[in-house]
Amino acid sequence: MTEHVAVDNLIIWEFDFAMTTFYEVDTDLINPLLPKQISPMEIVPGVSLLNITAFNFPEGGLGHLPNFQELIASIVVTPDLSRGVPKFAMFVFSLGSTCQEHLDHSADYYKLPSYKKLEYGKINRADNAIEFGDTDGSILTMNNCGTNIGDFLGHERYFQAFALQDGNLFIADLYL
């Protein structure tokens, strides 16, 4: 059964930096990672998308929380159109953050699975680069080598995040 997180009392996440990348992966490798109730969005037959996204949330960007960084690993999936048409829908299989309170909130409210608290999230705005690490060292370094970086601030976007918890599939409406 699919549980829906209520859309009343929506929380709007306000970020000031984001970077995302997509990797093409054979659907046969993706399917075992997904609950049977959802399916990956294929860009061509047999090819799905793995997504890595990093955010910087300034102090107050999510309620009373301090400035923190977030790192998400997800698979792009078919959306639930009965809830609206999102920019995209994702099945989140790992969430990392530099703020434990954010991880706790995300697990409780959105049912998102957390990796663990990250030791650091370094944002280099001048070079459009990020680096994240945990107690074992660096886990991700990413930079945008493009010269035309779009304006993502000041535009509210709707996303759907699917998560599996205790055998139940949850859908969270996210507004960024």
Where does each model-flagged region fall?
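Hydrophobic, proline/glycine-rich low-complexity stretches
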Residues: 1-59
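Intrinsically disordered, low-complexity segments enriched in polar/charged residues with Gly/Pro
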Residues: 8-10, 62-63, 146-148, 162
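Phenylalanine-focused residue identity feature
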Residues: 15-17, 22, 55-57, 68, ...
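Interaction-surface and assembly-scaffold signal
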Residues: 1-2, 103-176
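Short beta-strand element of the conserved SAM-dependent methyltransferase core
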Residues: 20-23, 75, 143-144
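Weak global preference for isoleucine
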Residues: 11-12, 30, 38, 43, ...
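Aromatic- and glycine-enriched beta-alpha-beta binding-site module
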Residues: 57-139
